Design a protein with these regions (language model features):
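N-terminal alpha-helical transmembrane segments of multi-pass membrane transport
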Residues: 2-166, 556-561
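Helix-loop-helix module between adjacent transmembrane segments
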Residues: 16, 36, 51-59, 93, ...
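Membrane-embedded translocation segments of transport machinery
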Residues: 218-480, 502, 526-532
């Protein structure tokens, strides 16, 4: 069916296709009255709520244990997975750039004749407000200053160049963190979600992103797992931004009214005050509430930026803008692949290294961006209908990056200028004026690097004479409004995820998730205290790690989706006779037994398949022997290492195990090539290494049952199993007709 024939009625009905599990089967879900109107996926909603509220309870009951555990995570994850974070970001960026210039760039996210729902200016303000608005106020001044002067994690570079070069490098590092590598994760997922949602009629939920790869299995436990992870990641990603905003709000209010102390208690009060405003905003919906708030926030931010631009030194800001843009483009590849490999070892003979810099900055940011991906991407997808792929990439990739460069050139430049002026005036962290806790400046100057990060923004605003208080007050209003916008958008996205993509979930459910956001932010503040920023960084890194793997699969899904839609890939072409995870979704006694046997003897099924590929049963046992020897040798060596019989022998075992994976990859690759199954050797290696029992069963099953099958459905509209008959659509659209008394 051509996508142009999908009627608007079908698409509206598809958006309201909801499911719940009864006896391991999926059924359509309507609205239920339990004294109130609710529409949700109970599996996703309950499990997600239990995980999040369990974390909140853990933070409140055992804050010391949470702190120590977070410290361990913060060390272990970057040490182990820095390479994965760095490489994945670069790969996604390269993929999106290639997609932009490909022939698929003109494909529209919707019907061919559809127009964009929002004007470009409104669209930009909405996606920017959901993306990074509130965080730019927090880091606009602070991050360049931190990179310029020795901070908590020291400087990345030590005495390598002049002070001017050091200042420029601080801007370069800041732009690296807030540029292409931030927005690339939102582009990949947002584009995929909009594509499958508006062109193929799938529900607007993260599980739909995997439909091009696993078909109808997204409506089973795999889809539940994806949505649960997405809800949890979204909650922690949004709360990171909210807590940063709260800490800055507290510092700003204290600056204007000294009787209001900077304390965790006051910050918690601010959380719930602003959360109350967000709950009120929830009733206004997307087009009125979030749209108008986003436009107001963006306008206020631009107004403040222009005032600072003219108040400070316009020529200096313009010079810095042009210069920083050039340096950013010049060094983006070099910085994008830098992992601080030597610095993380912490053994430099000259001691000129910052061992904690990478995990405190780049990896923390990458984890934060990835954790926010479900939230920002789904929100962007919701407002992107009617745009082409190329228009989408430009709007969500180039425009926000350009604005971020402008923002940091103005505010970061102002902060660096104050820092350098204070240094020339001999203001140090021990000075009576301008020092860490000073309430008064020295001739309008503070030393930002000596000050609390929450108040650096207001230190810079205060230097503009009589306008300082006005700018500070205006900044507080902007931060508070961005807080409301982020909370409102976050609760909307989380509610959609927990309701199987329902575009208009009940308000009460959004209120529940807004309250959950407030509770999570409160827990992070309570645990972190004065070190709340460390707690936030740890949560971001930890929640972003598992989603990095999911994002890699989503990139593959996006590429497959556009190729199928363009007719360059036959979705009904040759496939493996069974999917890797079919045994979990549709288990049989035979398949379960085969997988269990393959856990301990994968060589048997793999060797059988290898012999059948070559049609030489005599070589079957040769293949089995070649794979069995390294597999069992690895296990034996791990046992010897554990028993302290032979120190270091486990590494020999790991090497042999890698050889087993490589050989098994060759077997799976030969099966694919023989039967012309779509894929590549990298996918084969990943399948064998991560899911070797399932891969072994899949290979043997295919060789014994290799009749052509249409294993994965890829219709342009919603699959038949999920479509709502047009005759029932009016009932679904009528709230009274959908309600059932329980």
């Amino acid at each position: 069916m051509d996508n142009s024939t999908c009627s608007s009625e079908q698409e509206d009905a598809a958006n309201r296709c909801r499911w719940f599990r009864i006896n391991w089967k999926w059924c359509k879900m309507g609205s239920y009255r339990l004294g109130i109107n609710i529409r949700l996926n109970p599996v996703v909603s309950l499990v997600s709520a239990l995980i999040i509220w369990g974390f909140v309870a853990w933070c409140i009951i055992k804050p010391e244990t949470v702190n120590s555990t977070m410290a361990e995570w913060k060390t272990w994850i970057p040490t182990t997975f820095t390479w994965m974070y760095i490489r994945a970001q670069d790969a996604w960026a390269g993929f999106i750039i290639y997609l932009y210039f490909s022939k698929y760039g003109n494909m529209k996210l919707g019907k061919p004749d559809e127009k964009p729902e929002f004007k470009d200016a409104t669209y930009f303000t909405m996606l920017f407000g959901a993306g990074t608005g509130i965080s730019l106020f927090y880091f606009g001044v602070a991050e360049p200053v931190w990179h310029y002067a020795p901070g908590f994690y020291e400087k990345r570079h030590y005495n390598r160049y002049t002070d001017n070069q050091r200042a420029q490098d601080s801007i370069n590092l800041t732009l690296f963190h807030w540029g292409i590598h931030e927005w690339i994760v939102y582009v990949v997922v947002g584009l995929l979600l909009a594509f499958v949602g508006y062109r193929q009629g799938l529900p607007m939920t993260m599980r739909s992103c995997m439909y091009p790869l696993i078909g109808d299995k997204i409506y089973g436990w795999i889809g539940d797992a994806i949505d649960i992870i997405s809800v949890v990641c979204t909650m922690f990603g949004v709360c990171t931004s909210l807590v940063l905003g709260v800490m800055q709000l507290n510092a700003g209010v204290h600056r204007l009214e000294s009787s209001v102390e900077v304390s965790t208690f006051n910050q918690i009060i601010i959380v719930w005050c602003v959360m109350a405003c967000a709950i009120v905003s929830i009733n206004s919906g997307l087009k009125l509430g979030i749209r108008r708030l986003s436009e107001t926030c963006f306008a206020l931010g631009v107004f403040i930026m222009m005032l600072v631009f003219f108040f400070d030194a316009p020529c200096y800001s313009l010079n810095l803008l042009v210069q920083s843009t050039g340096y950013y483009m010049q060094t983006i590849v070099q910085r994008g692949i830098h992992t601080d490999a030597f610095a993380q070892l912490g053994n430099a003979p000259d001691r000129k290294e910052a061992t904690g810099w990478m995990d405190a900055w780049t990896i923390s940011y990458w984890g934060w961006w990835i954790a926010r991906t479900p939230f920002v991407s789904m929100f962007i997808a919701k407002i992107s209908r009617g745009r082409t792929i190329r228009q989408f990439i430009i709007a969500t990739f180039a425009a926000p990056v350009a604005f971020s460069i402008l923002w940091f050139s103005v505010f970061g430049g102002a902060g660096l200028q104050m820092e350098r002026k204070a240094a020339l005036a001999n203001i140090t962290c021990d000075s009576a004026l301008g020092r860490t806790n000073a309430s008064e400046s020295l001739n309008g100057l503070f030393r930002p690097s000596c000050r609390d990060e929450n108040g650096m923004w207001f230190d810079v605003m205060s230097q503009y004479g009589d306008m300082g208080s006005f700018l500070s007050a205006l900044s507080l209003i902007s931060i508070a409004l961005y807080f409301v916008t982020s909370s409102d958008s976050g609760s909307l996205v989380i509610d959609c995820l927990s309701a199987n993509g329902d575009p208009k979930p009940p308000v009460l459910q959004r209120v529940f998730w807004a309250l959950t956001e407030g509770a999570t932010a409160t827990a992070l503040l309570y645990v972190g205290g004065n070190e709340a920023l460390n707690a936030l960084q740890t949560v971001s890194i930890a929640s972003g790690a598992p989603y990095t793997i999911i994002l890699c699969f989503m990139s593959k899904a996006l590429w497959k989706a556009v190729k199928v839609e363009a007719g360059d890939l036959d979705p009904n072409g040759p496939q493996f006779t069974t999917g890797l995870l079919d045994v979990l979704s549709t288990p049989t006694v035979e398949s379960v037994c085969k997988v269990i046997i393959s856990i301990f003897a994968p060589w048997y099924s793999m060797g059988t398949a290898a012999g059948m590929v070559e049609k030489q049963n005599g070589r079957m046992w040769t293949h089995m022997l070649i794979m069995a020897l390294p597999f069992y040798a690895c296990i034996s060596m791990l046992v010897l290492e554990r028993l302290c019989v032979f120190s270091g022998i486990c590494y020999v075992g790991y090497t042999l195990l890698f050889g087993f994976f490589a050989y098994a990859t060759g077997v799976r690759n030969s099966i694919r090539e023989k039967y012309e199954i779509n894929g590549n050797i990298a996918e084969d290696f990943f399948a064998v290494m991560v899911l070797y029992p399932f891969a072994a069963y899949q290979m043997e099953h295919h060789m014994k049952n290799h009749k052509p099958t249409n294993h994965i459905q890829n219709g342009h509209c919603l699959p038949e199993s999920c479509r709502i008959p047009l005759g029932e659509m009016e009932k679904l659209m009528d709230p009274d007709a959908r309600k059932t008394d329980v």
